Amino acid sequence: MYQDLIRNELNEAAETLANFLQDEANIHAIQRAAVLLADSFKAGGKVLSCGNGGSHCDAMHFAEELTGRYRENRPGYPAIAISDVSHLSCVSNDFGYEYVFSRYVESVGRAGDVLLGISTSGNSGNVIKAIEAARAQGMKVITLTGKDGGKMAGSADVEIRVPHFGYADRIQEIHIKVIHILIMLIEKEMAKG
């Protein structure tokens, strides 16, 4: 009944991944991001992650597998997803939703820390404000974006962009693969000492 639709969806997902893989710059960006994060951890820094909707879930997934575990048992790494409901609702109510991430970055972000901002469009205003706050704090910035990078293009120390212009779910599928690879590489870097 839906076999052709299922095949089409999986083929489109495979094609999106193949297109991402063809650009060697993406491979280098993932490596640079992992080393940047590991260097921050080694120096006593932490990572703050943020995004909206599915990207928010990805930000939480990233932090959870750093503080908990990925594939192997190892010490936890300092990672915080900006996801505290009381903070999000307070700032949304008192200041506006565009400040929910930046207020948190201003409160706990420090020089030497890293912000991971995730937006499939690259146009999420609250993530952009978080990037601005991170810069003001002396933090490094990594972004996971899609399409043409949107307004976030060029705002990060390392941008990992999925140049897919269809639905956001295809971009998110690559983002979660990148997140898992980042964690694997961070573990390898941290094991070096």
Swiss-Prot record:
Its cofactor is Zn(2+). It holds the Pfam family SIS_2. GO terms for cellular component: cytoplasm. Keywords: Carbohydrate metabolism, Cytoplasm, Isomerase, Metal-binding, Zinc. Substrate binds at residues 52-54, 65, 93-94, 119-121, 124, 172. Binds 1 zinc ion per subunit. InterPro entries: GmhA/DiaA, Phosphoheptose_Isoase, SIS_dom, SIS_dom_sf, SIS_GmhA/DiaA_subfam. The keyword Transport does not apply. It comes from the Bacteria. The keyword Transport does not apply. It is found in: Cytoplasm. Signal peptide: none annotated. Pathway: Carbohydrate biosynthesis; D-glycero-D-manno-heptose 7-phosphate biosynthesis; D-glycero-alpha-D-manno-heptose 7-phosphate and D-glycero-beta-D-manno-heptose 7-phosphate from sedoheptulose 7-phosphate: step 1/1. Its main location: cytoplasm. Homotetramer. Belongs to the SIS family. GmhA subfamily. Catalyzes the isomerization of sedoheptulose 7-phosphate in D-glycero-D-manno-heptose 7-phosphate. The reaction produces a racemic mixture of D-glycero-alpha-D-manno-heptose 7-phosphate and D-glycero-beta-D-manno-heptose 7-phosphate. This is Phosphoheptose isomerase. It comes from Klebsiella pneumoniae subsp. pneumoniae (strain ATCC 700721 / MGH 78578).
